[in-house]
Amino acid sequence: MDLEAARNGTARRLDGDFELGSISNQGREKKKKVNLIGLLTLFRYSDWQDKLFMFLGTLMAIAHGSGLPLMMIVFGEMTDKFVDNTGNFSLPVNFSLSMLNPGRILEEEMTRYAYYYSGLGGGVLVAAYIQVSFWTLAAGRQIKKIRQKFFHAILRQEMGWFDIKGTTELNTRLTDDVSKISEGIGDKVGMFFQAIATFFAGFIVGFIRGWKLTLVIMAISPILGLSTAVWAKILSTFSDKELAAYAKAGAVAEEALGAIRTVIAFGGQNKELERYQKHLENAKKIGIKKAISANISMGIAFLLIYASYALAFWYGSTLVISKEYTIGNAMTVFFSILIGAFSVGQAAPCIDAFANARGAAYVIFDIIDNNPKIDSFSERGHKPDNIKGNLEFSDVHFSYPSRANIKILKGLNLKVKSGQTVALVGNSGCGKSTTVQLLQRLYDPTEGKISIDGQDIRNFNVRCLREIIGVVSQEPVLFSTTIAENIRYGRGNVTMDEIEKAVKEANAYDFIMKLPQKFDTLVGDRGAQLSGGQKQRIAIARALVRNPKILLLDEATSALDTESEAEVQAALDKAREGRTTIVIAHRLSTIRNADVIAGFEDGVIVEQGSHSELMKKEGIYFRLVNMQTAGSQILSEEFEVELSDEKAAGDVAPNGWKARIFRNSTKKSLKSPHQNRLDEETNELDANVPPVSFLKVLKLNKTEWPYFVVGTVCAIANGALQPAFSIILSEMIAIFGPGDDAVKQQKCNMFSLVFLGLGVLSFFTFFLQGFTFGKAGEILTTRLRSMAFKAMLRQDMSWFDDHKNSTGALSTRLATDAAQVQGATGTRLALIAQNTANLGTGIIISFIYGWQLTLLLLSVVPFIAVAGIVEMKMLAGNAKRDKKEMEAAGKIATEAIENIRTVVSLTQERKFESMYVEKLHGPYRNSVRKAHIYGITFSISQAFMYFSYAGCFRFGSYLIVNGHMRFKDVILVFSAIVLGAVALGHASSFAPDYAKAKLSAAYLFSLFERQPLIDSYSGEGLWPDKFEGSVTFNEVVFNYPTRANVPVLQGLSLEVKKGQTLALVGSSGCGKSTVVQLLERFYDPMAGSVLLDGQEAKKLNVQWLRAQLGIVSQEPILFDCSIAENIAYGDNSRVVPHDEIVRAAKEANIHPFIETLPQKYNTRVGDKGTQLSGGQKQRIAIARALIRQPRVLLLDEATSALDTESEKVVQEALDKAREGRTCIVIAHRLSTIQNADLIVVIENGKVKEHGTHQQLLAQKGIYFSMVNIQAGTQNL
């Protein structure tokens, strides 16, 4: 009887899962060989208890799996009894009452069978519970061990390993990969054994009860298997193609979102949208082809299934009529084999999960087994009692493991006596920081040795060595806990008094006492709640509580403004007393009083001595000091280059900061914390996105209504096939009462043909159902994606500044949201229609044939349905709850891994490990509770079927004996309703996750409906006929929305008349680039106004306004297309003719270079223009700006990134471009702006000085000192 459960649930579950996983993955795995670990290795962390759990779980799974085939034996015997006795009940009701005898016998027989069913049900109840809960328990225990071991292994790796691995990847491994293992070693293994047991038991029962029929049915199975395999192959080929097309669309979107400022400034939104839609169209076409081919094969599969029913019934009936089998036997064989065959489908997702787990475990176990050369957990090595602090580097060579071919140190020799302060100076990238890292033994030198007190540091115990060293680095990392805890990381057993003493020494006591929570103030993620100077002082206190013998200060004050610098510097001078100190500084004024100053160049020390000695030598140090003569205001070129816009500067005032990231791969751990915030963001989003009704989503698909009509009709037909099957089945059983054999054979032939007919019908209905909904779904996905992309391009800059809308997050949203919504509309609707039709027609037919039994069964259906739904919910909910629970642990892990350098230099690995382990108890306790709950719901949903069989047939026999129903009607009612219910229970399992889809839809609609503050698509506002080009800023006040508390412009007023050139100068972060962004109307000022030709910018149409401006920025972004297309991007309002492109190129001095390229103007420039040099990119950007014939030209440090040679060429091009246009120039190289009509010096967001070059020099103010500093630079 359970055939249908099998057909409806499992068969379809089989399609569902194939589609989702197994085959498409196999297809992909062939392409890239995935490393898997051995089957048993996966369980290498199981102890005897786990093994016992797994052993008992497997035994019970096998027992549980054998239940259904055994039930079929009972069913067969019962059918025989019914059929034999039916002859006695063909008389009218009143007779049967008088002939009590056979009725009494039948009822007794039925009662006995009811007990058998109940017995089996009881067995299944226990077995299913043990199977699921024991496997889940064992998995939970092992996963906890794996997480601990894995985190421990990560913490003990050496730095070089992290440089190569990248920290973000490790975080995903710790969360996603471990949960893949957990998926693969838990209840899925039990399910697998259960399915395999069902398979074998089914076939064994089949062979014992009737081998002939078994062989005939088996002959058909290969064809069915083959059709499934072909189907899966087709699917995976199309899926790969579709993914490739979507990936291309994704790349376009990512490129546009990554360069959003350029796109908006040049009005390129529609161009990007068209490029995106072109790729989406391709994907859609492939998707539709996929829907056609996949559904043809699905139709064929159903045709084959029905054909096999027809053959089996026809052959079976022949055997029954020739008295070889009884009808019961034939039934037993038929259903046992079917159940057995379909159980294979159920094993597929389990095998898939297991393969995923083996793949994930390969990487994880590999890391666990990796033994680092520098092991901070090791107890080996010398642990000296007291350290004097004499350091010596002798002939040290070194290159970073991640870039082994670039040598950083090339034979470094340096001696530091105990208690001395040595300062290291030199250009960026010369090896200063590397020296500090080698001393902490974060790396080992490739040649040479480093010794402390004459002992090679490799002989020290690693932990001991690091405990005697205190480090304060340029970007101190604080952990998101309280101030006191942060200081305690310096030394675990430190008392509150010691903390206060250290804080006083670090000049931090006063500001801490002013905070409301004092020492218990939380510092936020990476110390975000504190200013740079405050963080720095806490880091110094943290280094001091260690009471280190050796203090390493790596640009400890570079991130500070003058005021905090003085305080921190005083703290450092106090801290240095009596300790051996190595200082790295770019501000040379801070190291004048060092005992020894060592000048680095190119990985070796070229000079050392005191300040006065080195000044006499006139070497490197002398040159560096001269550049900085003005002292107060460093304009050292080398940093300014790296600062692409002042936003970066605003985040961290340091000039050197960006430079360091580029220079030093070792700073990788500064990788943006945003990536790890993505998960949290999704939660933030969930909280504030209003939910969306299902109908609203459907409305988007309303143009495709004909597809929906056809699809729904077919789905209803598919649903009705099942009750039709029940009718034919009951009719066939009824044939085999006493009677004429020839008539029987004739009827059987007829019914077999009807089965075949149903098969042909199902081919068409399944194909049409799948195809129509599939096509409508593809159209919807394409539509949603392009609407979403369009809506994103429409947003204002402040929206893009929000970390929740980083390029990565937006690209992911574009890719996943639309697909998830499709999952919940197309196929889901089809399934709902199909299952409702199934249960609906089933109930109607049942009421017609036997309302009493139908009522009894309907009272049971809710239980079966609810149990099915609960089980599916449990399955889905598991992962979600675990994720929540794991977040606390994940936070600790993420923090430790991202800031691994800090953790290691503070020797706090053990502390983090114990915090992590403590946080794992929650998820583990959860998994125990979950194991039991899940076990109970699963066992109830599995056993209920057996109990309902018992009740149904016992009551059925009563109805038959009393003449209320015929036997065939009992079978009909029973199969129609039970199968309908089973289908309903399963519907929830293969319908894609509805909740996810709702969330995605909600997110998409909130995006579609968001009204940007400055709408780039808007047609409102004035479109003046002519524009002279004068620009005025009137008392403008502005802060960036993402950092509302950091003032940028504080009442800025300036004016530039038409045709004039205005130059803006000032230190980084003073608001120069902000002026350009306000003019482009990326943002609106908070107070004051920006006027163009006397009209307020807000009143002008945005598109018109931007069309008047041409912008060339310091780091111009080019798109991955040809040179001609990049230049033409300057004017997206029309198709730019080729001769104009050439003219612009000539004006920008780039034409001769383009002519030398083989493909000339059709040369592709590569991603972000990587195929070109800086100067070439810069000149193409100038040509791009000139194409639009702008009235106002904005040059934001357009030459700063260039070497002298290219600078000259580009500068000429710019001078040519400025003719007859209003021009606003931002420059750090003052020589380039001497001939500007007006020079404005900005400081702290206000105008401090203005005038021509000569006037300003005469004032001897800020501009004067800046020119002087740079005059020194020229002799470099």
UniProtKB/Swiss-Prot annotation:
It comes from Mus musculus (Mouse). It is found in: Cell membrane; Apical cell membrane; Membrane raft; Cytoplasm. ATP 1 binds at R403, G429, C430, G431, K432, S433, T434, Q474, G1174, G1175, Q1176. The chain crosses the membrane at residues 48-70, 116-136, 186-207, 213-235, 294-315, 330-351, 709-729, 753-773, 829-849, 851-870, 931-953, 970-991. Glycans are attached at N88, N94. Expressed in the liver (at protein level). Expressed in adrenal, liver, muscle, spleen and heart. Expressed in multidrug-resistant cell lines. Disruption phenotype: Mice show severe necrotic damage of hepatocytes, strong portal inflammation, proliferation and destruction of the canalicular and small bile ductular tracts. Display almost complete reduction of biliary phospholipid secretion, although bile salt secretion is normal. Show also reduced cholesterol secretion. Knockout mice lacking both ABCB4 and ATP8B1 show lower hepatic damage compared with the single ABCB4 knockout mice. Display equivalent reduction of biliary phosphatidylcholine (PC) secretion as the single ABCB4 knockout mice. The lineage of its organism: Eukaryota, Metazoa, Chordata, Craniata, Vertebrata. Residues 622-646 are annotated as: Interaction with HAX1. This is Phosphatidylcholine translocator ABCB4. Residues 1-47, 137-185, 236-293, 352-708, 774-828, 871-930, 992-1276 are cytoplasmic. Residues 71-115, 208-212, 316-329, 730-752, 850, 954-969 are extracellular. Keywords: ATP-binding, Cell membrane, Cytoplasm, Cytoplasmic vesicle, Glycoprotein, Lipid transport, Membrane, Nucleotide-binding, Phosphoprotein, Repeat, Translocase, Transmembrane, Transmembrane helix, Transport. Energy-dependent phospholipid efflux translocator that acts as a positive regulator of biliary lipid secretion. Functions as a floppase that translocates specifically phosphatidylcholine (PC) from the inner to the outer leaflet of the canalicular membrane bilayer into the canaliculi between hepatocytes. Translocation of PC makes the biliary phospholipids available for extraction into the canaliculi lumen by bile salt mixed micelles and therefore protects the biliary tree from the detergent activity of bile salts. GO terms for cellular component: apical plasma membrane; clathrin-coated vesicle; cytoplasm; cytosol; focal adhesion; intercellular canaliculus; membrane; membrane raft. The gene is Abcb4.
